């Protein structure tokens, strides 16, 4: 991940949804949308954003289109992605769960039930949170608190991405053999 300014990482700042999907996109090697042939003309899939708040030319445009195409990210409703909204801890867990191909559980005891605020996890996030906890990608705050709806700090995102990458054998890595050393783009440094 890059810093927020030269020589400044800002670990306690929150990470936006756009910054997270950009980090994942860069870790995946910045793939171009696949071309599709229609009536003899080649067209790029998802040339038009499905979200009103993801305009063509925005620094996060390609990463969001990639994330949607790969099934990694979804909008927040009403045709919006909310790129500037802080990513929550449960959103982060679910996004990484989707990156892993949404594997099924192993039937073991639910790790999520050990946390005092397990009931605060949104129903759509339970499976992803359970998966991330089981693999120790996600850890609790202050002991036994998940804080699922709270914003994820840049430090938490960096730690979770590192643990996520550590869980993969090289052949099964969802990012292929990409060795991206700069997965997060600063808002002032737009993607081409």
Describe each model-derived feature in a short phrase.
Residues 21, 93, 158:
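IQ-motif-like calmodulin-binding regions
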Residues 2-63, 70-90, 98-126, 139-152, ...:
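Feature responds to low-complexity, polar/acidic, surface-exposed segments characteristic
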Residues 68-69, 133:
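Alpha-helix C-terminal capping/helix-coil junction sites
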Residues 126-129, 154, 158:
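Short amphipathic alpha-helical surface patches that serve as generic macromolecular interface elements
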